[in-house]
Amino acid sequence: MNLFVTDQCPVKSAHALDDKRVGKLLMECNQMMSLAIKVHDPFGDWECGPTLLTAGQPHINHPVSIWVRENISNFEWCLSHALELFAEFVLRFDKEHASGHRIPYIASKRSCLPSGELLPFQNSARNAGIGVDYSHLPVPVSYREYLRERWETDKMPVRWTNR
């Protein structure tokens, strides 16, 4: 569960992701935003389903999930990022990612989030399994370095189709 904040701007951050991660991160954004709604409005008028909220409460205590639900500004950053990830997926693959169809419903339920200014991004740019930890660096730099390192270990060559 992560956002891979390679830039303070959610649009630029989405553009920086390689093909492999565009769809994956779109699904993760939707999971974290769905979780934020469920936590702040546990008895609300919402539903789970293919074009609705995601099911369950995965990664409820992950630091990035907590950051997304901390306030409306953090949630809005994630929402903007998800919208751009969906657009990126269409641009790169000439088809829609099914997870993108959740976004309008998720956006319609965001009023339950508390107000607040955008908080510093959660830095989770580490993976003990492969011995990578850039969490000591400033957030955008840490994620760019983390991804560079991950790309070197990927089995398939990294691609940015139509970019």
Spans of model-derived segments:
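Aromatic-residue-lined binding/catalytic grooves and analogous aromatic/hydrophobic interfacial grooves
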Residues: K109-R163
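Generic intrinsically disordered, low-complexity segments enriched for polar/acidic and small residues
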Residues: M1, H59, I72, F86, ...
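A glycine-rich phosphate-binding loop feature that marks nucleotide/adenosyl-phosphate handling sites
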Residues: H101-S108
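An N-terminal structural lobe/cap that precedes and organizes the functional/catalytic core
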Residues: M1-H97
